[in-house]
């Protein structure tokens, strides 16, 4: 559960790092296929806060579940939104103009085209980004832009030119096993 909560924030932060600053981000707090019996209002509220802290300009969510529950029975969801709005607005105001900083977890467009699929399985096409959640859970701040110390993991190493790799090595560079294998 803890890793999932960190992943909510980090997944959105990674997406935001790829966008230009003038893009308005309307982040969806996913409530489907959940019902009020499988996802608490507190969890929905926490996810709204995590999206706000990650920098969402606005939040989108399904107020009504997919079970066609009558509106009067969904009133607690409406109350949650009403009650959390001042808190979310304050967090958004405090967050405005700020960016994540810390260990640079590098990401390159096109890396998915370089993935190896030795087993021929569909799940091998999913880029594994365990470090996005691991370091924050250990208390190590991260960002998704180049910094003085960076981590190059997995297939990302194949996305770097030799010159870029040498430049990164001139700073501080951490390689995971797969990246080291690709570099060598």
Q: Where do the model's predicted regions map?
A:
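Hydrophobic targeting/anchoring helices
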Residues: 1-130
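Helical hinge/lid and interdomain linker segments adjacent to catalytic or ligand-binding clefts
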Residues: 115, 120-184
């Amino acid at each position: 559960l803890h890793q999932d909560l960190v992943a909510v924030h980090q997944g959105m932060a990674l997406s935001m790092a790829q966008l230009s600053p003038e893009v308005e981000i309307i982040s969806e707090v996913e409530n489907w296929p959940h019902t009020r019996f499988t996802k608490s209002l507190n969890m929905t509220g926490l996810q709204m806060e995590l999206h706000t802290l990650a920098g969402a300009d606005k939040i989108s969510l399904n107020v009504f579940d997919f079970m066609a529950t009558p509106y009067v029975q969904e009133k607690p969801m409406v109350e949650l939104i009403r009650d959390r709005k001042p808190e979310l607005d304050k967090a958004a105001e405090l967050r405005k103009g700020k960016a994540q900083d810390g260990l640079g977890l590098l990401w390159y467009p096109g890396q998915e085209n370089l993935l190896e699929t030795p087993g021929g399985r569909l799940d091998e096409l999913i880029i594994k980004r365990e470090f996005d959640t691991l370091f924050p859970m250990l208390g190590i701040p991260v960002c998704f832009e180049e910094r003085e110390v960076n981590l190059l993991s997995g297939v990302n190493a194949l996305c770097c030119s030799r010159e870029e790799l040498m430049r990164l090595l001139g700073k501080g560079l951490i390689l995971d096993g797969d990246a080291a294998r690709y570099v060598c």
